[in-house]
């Protein structure tokens, strides 16, 4: 069975739209036994939550179920190595300017490599950045929300 990891943009879209929230909830219910949370995504979500009440809700409703079920993944040493190699390749081949690189892109590299190691499909609406990363290493991704096989 395929494993899945949701990108932060899935949770953010769900927090801004009832329709997106319903789509995410349906996918989570169907894929629960195959769904993992990256600590990279958890950090992005926590950093973007400004009000204490919202942070408590994020912890309780979104993050806690993954931690409780042991479905949390961390970037490995190899993921950090891949981050450095990917950035170096993009500097050399695309003219990437590191000081102007958004943190979110750095996080995307760590997330993509972590999914590769887990053998999981990364669910994200951010295909543009992931196409750039795919020039350096392969990983599976899909737009929200794929059919389950």
Which sequence ranges carry the predicted segments?
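Short active-site oxyanion
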Residues: 1-2, 32-35, 69-71, 116-121
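Short, well-structured N-terminal submotif of metal-dependent ribonuclease cores
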Residues: 1-41, 47-65
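Acidic, PIN/NYN-like endoribonuclease modules and their adjacent C-terminal/linker elements
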Residues: 3, 112-149
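Alpha-helix capping/helix-boundary segments
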Residues: 10, 41, 79, 111, ...
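General small-molecule cofactor/ligand-binding pocket signal
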Residues: 36, 73, 140-142
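Phosphate- and divalent-cation-binding pockets in alpha/beta enzyme and binding domains
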Residues: 44, 82, 132-133
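Cytochrome P450 catalytic domain signature, combining two hallmark sequence patches
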Residues: 52-57, 91-92, 140-142
